[in-house]
Amino acid sequence: MSDPLILIPARLAATRLPDKPLAEICGEPMIVHVWRRAIESGLGPVVVCTDTPAIVAAVEAVGGLGVLTRPDHPSGSDRLAEALAIIDPEGRHDVVVNVQGDLPTIDPAVIAASVTPLADRAVDIATLCAVITRPEERTEPSVVKVVGSPVSPTRLRALYFTRATAPWGEGPLHHHIGLYAYRRRALERFVALGPSPLEQREKLEQLRALEAGMRIDATIVDDVPLGVDTPHDLDRARAVMAARRLN
């Protein structure tokens, strides 16, 4: 596996938290915190891809790299594919890691762990999950579950992703974490496919890959990182970052 490239897609179009990537956390925009966590993972170069010049400016102000993409992409994966073609037309990077732009407190080690399943050449896409520990999350549709077959104590081969409570019976349920590491050829194939029936029904983009016969494996990590989607989440992220700076 050659030098991975980390891409962080970001947009200002969030409805519950307007201008989310530029929200201030401990004196810096949230997107800058995510960029720093990605740099700290040590995986490889990090680029923010966005349709908003203000986001590029915020990242470049701290020495980072941002690239402007078209505003009309139907999905984040399409934005990644365009950014990849702009940044690396020669194809030097054969692994692309997609880190969501609303994870300012994510542990860099978790980002690094995302690529581990790609050491297995049978795996097309790698992702992350964590065991669900809160009973209410087992039935919450916004908590996406990975239904998977164990490959090792810390890795599942994903057979399905669902908003339902699954699998049935005794045993753990796994909360999917939407961070992906793609083989470049898998990303290119993925965006060339049209939306699939199960993807449209569950509203889960990753089902497109499974329906097309691609293999997705998930590394099991200890915790689900805090995603910032609401003003309450933003307050929590500010408190976490402030506590880290005091320690």
From Swiss-Prot:
GO terms for biological process: CMP-keto-3-deoxy-D-manno-octulosonic acid biosynthetic process; lipopolysaccharide biosynthetic process. Keywords: Cytoplasm, Lipopolysaccharide biosynthesis, Nucleotidyltransferase, Transferase. Its EC number is 2.7.7.38. It comes from the Bacteria. It holds the Pfam family CTP_transf_3. It catalyses: 3-deoxy-alpha-D-manno-oct-2-ulosonate + CTP = CMP-3-deoxy-beta-D-manno-octulosonate + diphosphate. SUPFAM superfamilies: Nucleotide-diphospho-sugar transferases (SSF53448). It is found in: Cytoplasm. Pathway: Nucleotide-sugar biosynthesis; CMP-3-deoxy-D-manno-octulosonate biosynthesis; CMP-3-deoxy-D-manno-octulosonate from 3-deoxy-D-manno-octulosonate and CTP: step 1/1; Bacterial outer membrane biogenesis; lipopolysaccharide biosynthesis. GO terms for cellular component: cytosol. One of its GO terms (molecular function) is 3-deoxy-manno-octulosonate cytidylyltransferase activity. Activates KDO (a required 8-carbon sugar) for incorporation into bacterial lipopolysaccharide in Gram-negative bacteria. Belongs to the KdsB family. This is 3-deoxy-manno-octulosonate cytidylyltransferase. It comes from Methylobacterium sp. (strain 4-46). The lineage of its organism: Bacteria, Pseudomonadati, Pseudomonadota, Alphaproteobacteria, Hyphomicrobiales.
